């Protein structure tokens, strides 16, 4: 069982309850999707007590079906969800297509309406893609993929920057009933290789190069390096992002995007798929080190995406949603691609960073396109808060109605900065909690109706039945003013259908820790008003800039360095990124660093950058004589975390360690590193 959260965070609920901004309803051109808080309470109760009835109505209203479903979920009664490792099936016997729901129905209704607003890395680079044009582009690529032998159920690997062609790619893949497996374009060639092999992808779609923050990234070269060990990959489709003529190209295997698109006509019919057919794989970090291919299926995921987009953000067809998240992560999947397009809205796709060419970039985009909903990680907000309000003041942000936060809890002082300087007291902040595995929001305020507390994820979304469990006994803590681990009692439509090719691992990770519950991996509290607070991971995952990284994966990379004997990676608080990575490293017995210690540390960091990617690089390398272990050989990461947090007086009884004397040396090393 995970360790219990030691420090109580219930004092956080002293923050005054914030009511939704006055005039929220009047500032929308359209009537809100939910009338008031009482309506939420009524619908939420129905979604828990009678999920079949609730989700039947929602699925009929929000999705188009080629063949109507017979039953929203089976078994109808959620009391046996997760029993024996089983998950319910959703929308039994229904057939639909994700691309049709995201593109065709809106292209038919209004082909000239903008679907995607693209803002390039440079402020003068951008274009608008209408729903009609999007349908043509998606149809062309769908035909190209079909001609290359991609069929229903196959997986296609995607390694693209944040450009419109990335969205076209995802939609074309699901149009023909295949699965996309997007790999974040900041991952190393080794990480890309592992994901291509695990998903058994035979086609890769990429770009010649990428642009980010004024820098050029050799995207195609990374793909080529990965494919040296992926013999089953037949073809690579390459989009010309920069047009660099020196980019490596393998005739026969490699195909230029523009050549393939020119071969085909403007329409290709969507392939009907069953409700529970796979939609995509997205790899996330796991505590065992091997990345997990989280699988989402079609109908349940689509419904979760569209409902949360409409109700969390109050998105309407005439709205513009700017999600500042990459498609390499679940935030980009659900709230840059599927959510806004399923709702018939316009999605802003931003290639760059919040600091290039200066710290006003986000606000320039909001002003330029009159964005209505903005969704971002607290990491970016901390960076922009530190830069100062001078980068905000000259922009008109009055179009904003909703400000979202994602990836980690937002600190109260950042919440207030966001509210006062970006929302200017007129936009509603929704601090959302969810996971790659959940597909869509689990805990969140609903725009315009839910009171909020800075730092709290507020209340559950429809169909989500959260419980706080005692981490030791697994018993529910039913009252308010309690703290433990967060679990979900019954399944919701967009829950992952498992880990690709490894369902037992899914059971072991999420269902086995607490019988008859889905275990989130997070500590949580429910305050005296029933509001939920997320307290951080209780497993071996660190959260850096809103991205979950496996400590085991980083440790495995460090071991690749020739003098590293053992390593233990933990997260620690960082003002900018929320958490940063610290690596405790002990050297092989016959190795020493001498006076070259700083260069050796740099080499270790570079090893991680090469094996995983720059975002996973440790911020701190701590060379120690040994790691604290139990007599069975388990490394006590709890001790390492507490020493880093300055809580060496709270280590408890260390006499049971096999090597208790090493603890003082670790404390000394940490103190020296912090000087």
UniProtKB/Swiss-Prot annotation:
Bias kind Polar residues: ranges: 1-10
A GO molecular function held by the record: acetate-CoA ligase activity
Entry GO terms, CC: cytosol
Catalysed reaction, written as an equation: acetate + ATP + CoA = acetyl-CoA + AMP + diphosphate
Enzyme Commission identifier(s): 6.2.1.1
Region named Disordered: 1-32
Binding of ATP, residues: 407-409, 431-436, 522, 537, 548
UniProt enzyme class: ligase
Keywords assigned by UniProt, alphabetized: ATP-binding, Ligase, Nucleotide-binding
Xref: Pfam families: ACAS_N, AMP-binding, AMP-binding_C
Keyword Nucleotide-binding: yes
Residues that bind CoA: 212-215, 331, 545, 609
Entry-linked SUPFAM superfamilies: Acetyl-CoA synthetase-like
Gene Ontology biological-process entries: acetyl-CoA biosynthetic process; acetyl-CoA biosynthetic process from acetate
Sequence similarity: Belongs to the ATP-dependent AMP-binding enzyme family.
Name of the featured protein: Acetyl-coenzyme A synthetase 1
Organism: Candida albicans (Yeast)
């Amino acid at each position: 069982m995970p360790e219990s959260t030691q420090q109580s965070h219930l004092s956080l609920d002293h923050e005054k309850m914030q009511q939704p901004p006055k005039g929220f309803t009047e500032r929308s051109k359209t009537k809100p999707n939910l009338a008031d808080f009482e309506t939420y309470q009524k619908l939420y109760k129905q979604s828990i007590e009678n999920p079949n009835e609730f989700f039947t109505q929602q699925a009929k209203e929000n999705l188009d079906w080629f063949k109507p479903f017979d039953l929203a979920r089976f078994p109808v009664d959620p009391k046996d969800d997760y029993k024996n490792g089983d998950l319910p099936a959703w929308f039994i016997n229904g057939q639909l297509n994700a691309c049709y729901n995201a593109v065709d129905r809106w292209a038919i209704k209004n082909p000239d309406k903008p679907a995607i607003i693209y803002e390039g890395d440079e402020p003068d680079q951008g274009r608008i893609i209408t729903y009609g044009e999007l349908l043509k582009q998606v149809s062309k690529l769908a035909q190209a993929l079909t001609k290359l032998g991609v069929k229903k159920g196959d997986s296609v690997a995607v390694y693209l920057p944040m450009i419109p062609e990335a969205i076209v790619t995802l939609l074309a893949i699901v149009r023909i009933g295949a699965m996309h497996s997007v790999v974040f374009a900041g991952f190393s060639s080794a990480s890309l290789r592992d994901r291509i092999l695990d998903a058994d992808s035979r086609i890769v779609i990429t770009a010649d190069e990428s642009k980010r923050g004024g820098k050029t990234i050799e995207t195609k070269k990374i793909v080529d390096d990965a494919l040296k060990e992926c013999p089953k990959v037949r073809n690579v489709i390459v989009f010309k992002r920069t047009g660099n003529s020196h980019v490596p190209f393998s005739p026969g295997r490699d195909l230029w995007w523009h050549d393939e698109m020119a071969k085909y006509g403007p329409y290709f019919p969507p392939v009907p798929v069953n409700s529970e057919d796979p939609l995509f794989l997205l790899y996330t970090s796991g505590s065992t080190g091997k990345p997990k291919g989280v699988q989402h299926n079609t109908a349940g995921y689509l419904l979760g995406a569209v409902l949360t987009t409409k109700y969390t953000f109050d998105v309407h067809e005439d709205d513009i949603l700017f999600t500042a998240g990459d498609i390499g992560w679940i935030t980009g999947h659900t709230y840059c691609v599927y959510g806004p397009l399923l709702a018939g809205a316009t999605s802003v796709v931003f290639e760059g960073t919040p600091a290039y060419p200066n710290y006003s970039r986000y606000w320039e985009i909001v002003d330029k396109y009159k964005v209505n909903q903005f969704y971002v990680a607290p990491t970016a907000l901390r960076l922009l808060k530190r830069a100062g309000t001078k980068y905000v003041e000259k922009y008109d942000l009055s179009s904003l109605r909703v400000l979202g936060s994602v990836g980690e809890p937002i600190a109260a002082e950042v919440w207030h900065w966001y509210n006062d300087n970006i929302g200017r007291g007129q936009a509603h902040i929704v601090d959302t909690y969810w996971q790659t595995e959940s597909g869509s929001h689990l805990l969140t305020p609903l725009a315009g109706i839910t009171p909020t507390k800075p730092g709290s994820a507020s209340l559950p979304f429809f169909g989500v039945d959260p419980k706080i469990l005692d981490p030791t006994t697994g018993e529910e803590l039913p009252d308010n003013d309690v703290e433990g681990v967060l679990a979900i009692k019954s399944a919701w439509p967009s829950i992952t259908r498992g880990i690709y090719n490894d369902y037992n691992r899914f059971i072991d990770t999420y269902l086995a820790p607490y019988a008859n519950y889905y275990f989130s991996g997070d500590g949580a509290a429910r305050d005296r008003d029933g509001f939920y607070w997320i307290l951080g991971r209780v497993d071996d995952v660190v959260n850096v800039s809103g991205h979950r990284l496996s400590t085991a994966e980083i440790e495995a990379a460090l071991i690749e360095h020739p003098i590293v004997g053992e390593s233990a990676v933990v997260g620690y608080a960082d003002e900018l990124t929320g958490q940063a990575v610290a690596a405790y490293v002990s050297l092989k017995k016959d190795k020493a660093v001498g006076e070259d210690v700083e260069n050796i540390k740099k080499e270790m960091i570079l090893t991680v950058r090469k094996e995983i990617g720059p975002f996973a690089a440790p911020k701190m390398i701590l060379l120690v004589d040994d790691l604290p272990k139990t007599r069975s050989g388990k490394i006590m990461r709890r001790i390492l975390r507490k020493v880093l947090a300055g809580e060496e007086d709270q280590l408890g009884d260390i006499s049971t360690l096999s090597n208790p004397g090493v603890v003082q040396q670790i404390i000394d090393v940490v103190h020296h590193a912090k000087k």
